[in-house]
UniProtKB/Swiss-Prot annotation:
EC number(s) from the headed UniProt entry: 1.3.7.5
GO biological processes: phytochromobilin biosynthetic process
Protein role: Catalyzes the four-electron reduction of biliverdin IX-alpha (2-electron reduction at both the A and D rings); the reaction proceeds via an isolatable 2-electron intermediate, 181,182-dihydrobiliverdin.
InterPro entries xref list: Ferredoxin-dep_bilin_Rdtase, Ferredoxin_bilin_OxRdtase
Gene3D superfamilies assigned: 3.40.1500.20
Family classification: Belongs to the HY2 family.
Pfam families: Fe_bilin_red
Name assigned to this protein: Phycocyanobilin:ferredoxin oxidoreductase
Catalysed reactions, semicolon-separated: (2R,3Z)-phycocyanobilin + 4 oxidized [2Fe-2S]-[ferredoxin] = biliverdin IXalpha + 4 reduced [2Fe-2S]-[ferredoxin] + 4 H(+)
Enzyme class: oxidoreductase
Keywords: Oxidoreductase
Length: 245
């Protein structure tokens, strides 16, 4: 069981981040058999300084039979910047996509909110059941959709990347992430193991996803300024997007 009573920086973060963090943890606990995932020493909770402001990074990490690693990262820079980052890394024994979402918020509001179920199979497509369910979801209008980065071909056609401009759009985003989460958790429970040959192919897909995500220069620059290049490289490669064995 998750220790939800434990103090968390999400209680001081932007309301959308706080609501989404609670939602993610509640779905994990509802559907999955969670065991703690051991992060490298000193990287579970981190404090530093960036441009005179205190930077706090708080990680929640678990694993299950279906997921080799489930990572929720919350970060807060003074009173100026709040971040949520979440990825569910599948156990390559199962034909599951990658769930991922990120939110970046400041006093001015949410500047970026992205969520996706990203393919890991050799065809670069989601399983048929995922496609059917996601295609049937109600269409929502967002006033400011954002462009994916150059390496964004790892994402699916259902990827949602926006700058929500009001509380209604924030609620629509939260609703869509919840739909992604419920579908993904339910499908993971009925997923059938792959053959050894198939496992190698899905492992390659996950490897590609992590390798492309490691190219996110914005994340690297922030971490390097606060903790140095060596630490940033270690954190990105061992915590954020560790490559599967």
């Amino acid at each position: 069981m998750l220790d939800t009573a434990k103090s968390s920086i999400r209680q001081q973060q932007h309301p959308l981040i706080s609501r989404l963090a609670d939602l993610i943890l509640s779905y994990w606990e509802k559907y999955l058999e969670l065991d703690p995932y051991q992060l490298p020493d000193g990287l579970g909770y981190v404090e530093g300084r960036l441009e005179g402001e205190k930077l706090v990074i708080e990680n929640h990490c678990y694993h299950t039979p279906q997921f080799r690693k489930m990572h929720l990262e919350l970060a807060k820079l003074g009173n100026n910047l709040d971040i949520l980052h979440c990825v569910m890394f599948p156990n390559p024994h199962y034909p599951l996509p990658m769930f991922g979402c990120d939110i970046v918020a400041s006093k001015a509001g949410v500047s970026a909110a992205i969520a996706d179920l990203s393919p890991t199979n050799p065809q670069g497509t989601l399983p048929t059941t995922y496609q059917k369910v996601l295609s049937s979801l109600p269409k929502r209008d967002f006033s400011q959709r954002r462009d994916l980065p150059p390496w964004g071909d790892i994402f699916s056609e259902f990827c949602l990347f926006i700058r929500p401009t009001n509380s209604t759009e924030e609620t629509f985003f939260l609703e869509r992430v919840e739909q992604f989460l419920e579908l993904h958790c339910r499908q993971s429970l009925i997923a059938q193991p792959l053959s050894s040959n198939e496992q190698a192919l899905y492992l390659a897909g996950q490897y590609n996803y992590c390798s492309q995500q490691q190219k996110n220069d914005k994340t690297r620059r922030v971490l390097e300024k606060a903790f140095g290049a060596e630490w940033a490289d270690k954190y990105i490669n061992l915590v954020l997007f560790d490559l599967p064995d």
